[in-house]
């Protein structure tokens, strides 16, 4: 909910952020949910409406709190399909990760466990959902995808990936193995859990004892 996001933002500012040097990008996973057997036109209408309502609601709340979030153009909103155009090698990476999955039994094991953690069956659609989601955020944190932000304008030194919950095992495994041999450009690679307010450093995770839920 937009109201939850505002509360999380208020935790960061001014508690964690004291200088006007940070931008925020909200990414909507609308295209990810097309991995479904539902009719495409029905899904399009459903998620277009959902993204529109959520982003406008969030935009309004950011504006209402402008005394706290003073730099309005530091907040950027984008949909999943926009990210495809931000990495010219995306399709090559996607083909490669699918090939890796077919041959890596440990990767298969972790994605199966992730599906179970989220009360899902690892169908082809669910598998494609996981692989694409993990890959795109991996590419963001590896600097292969630069998220556009009107205020930051490409000057970012690092990106903090935030989500309400623990990262799936398959996502953590992707960083630990670094199949594409991409350099680490950030001091830490991981995910900030908005619920627990703790950062999960993927390179310090023992996946055999780690719990997603």
Place the predicted regions along the sequence by residue.
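Compositional signal for N-terminal targeting/processing segments
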Residues: 1-213
